[in-house]
Amino acid sequence: VRKICEDYGGRIKSFCTFDSSLSSIVDRAVGSKRFRVKVRTRGGHSYNDFGNDNAIAGLASLVGKLYKIQVPEGGKTTYNVGMISGGTSVNTIAQEAGMLYEFRSDKRENLEYMERQFMEVLDRAKAEGMDVSFQVIGVRPCEGQVDPAQKQALTDWAHRVVEEMTGQPPKHHAGSTDCNIPLSLGIPSVCVGSFRGAGAHT
């Protein structure tokens, strides 16, 4: 989708894609930003070098601080540490530990707020002597300036089609789909469900 929008964005009048359950329509974009964070220390032997900084302990303190961030009001904003790793053995003071962290929101200004909070946590840790680095591993934009009338017309059309196919009026909600990029470029877009079932990401 990113490549399609790069090559043909100026010629696309509207965009429709398929994801999630058949009873749903995603008509608002949830943007996100994802990071790989690493903490490094000298490490050492758990007995002989006791007292040396432990990368896992340092990472744990970062996770605790990130989870104290108060999400902004307006829209829905979330964050998550989805994976952690580190250390080499039970009797080794960990020299390196890492995590995957993301935040999401259906408001662009809230994404910007969460990024500022994330950077403040890392900057404070660095100022206190922690060797911490990060890498951006994923960016999905929020909605841009989309013509409200054109977007509503597309959403209404999708609603009618789904209701005719299923006999049930679909539920509308925000989500992170292939519509994010065209919506960020101002292209009216909608994501229609395509399956019956449950348990996504389990």
Q: How would you label these PLM feature ranges?
A:
Residues S20-D27, R36-G51, A55-T202:
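Metal-dependent amide/peptide-bond hydrolase catalytic core
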